[in-house]
């Protein structure tokens, strides 16, 4: 299945620190992956929120658009913004079912970026697995600079771009 192949090739690209573009060029993104992993913050439900520098905005515009998370984020990045995408995540399995070829939002994010590298091994998943009830907490994982290397349809990009992703169990 194509989605499963994309998941395997994403894992290979992360492990190799490089991927091939449609033009045949090799893109070394190992530094981007390591930076994404180093910047990741696991925020327990009772942890204080990290402080951030706020930027004033002249106005807020709300739009409803028929786009995927990646399409919308790419549009904002092209306009010079730094979007933060909400990953509606599986609370017990990093990447949800992306390795099995599932096709929900989290799985597409993991197939198209190095998000999985920032989620794998996070203590949130073990904590949720140990819960006596089949639910999750408000624990979140902030991955502020995840390199995106593919479009939603699986086409490798000539140059990766960075996306902030907030992972929260849905």
Feature-to-residue mapping (PLM):
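Macrodomain-like recognition of ADP-ribose-binding/processing modules
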Residues: 1-170
């Amino acid at each position: 299945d194509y989605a499963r192949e994309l998941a395997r090739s994403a894992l290979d690209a992360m492990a190799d620190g490089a991927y091939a573009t449609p033009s045949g060029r090799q893109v070394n993104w190992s530094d981007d992956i390591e930076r994404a992993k180093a910047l990741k913050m696991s925020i327990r439900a009772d942890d204080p929120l990290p402080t951030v520098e706020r930027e004033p905005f002249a106005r807020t515009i709300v739009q409803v658009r028929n786009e995927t998370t990646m399409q919308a984020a790419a549009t904002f990045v092209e306009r010079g913004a730094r979007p933060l995408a909400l990953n509606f995540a599986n609370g017990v399995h990093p990447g949800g079912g992306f390795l099995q070829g599932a096709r929900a939002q989290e799985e597409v994010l993991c197939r198209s970026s190095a998000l999985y590298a920032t989620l794998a091994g996070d203590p949130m998943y073990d904590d949720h697995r140990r819960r006596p009830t089949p639910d999750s907490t408000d624990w979140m994982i902030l991955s502020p600079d995840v390199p995106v290397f593919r479009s939603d349809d699986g086409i490798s990009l000539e140059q990766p771009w960075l996306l902030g992703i907030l992972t929260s169990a849905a």
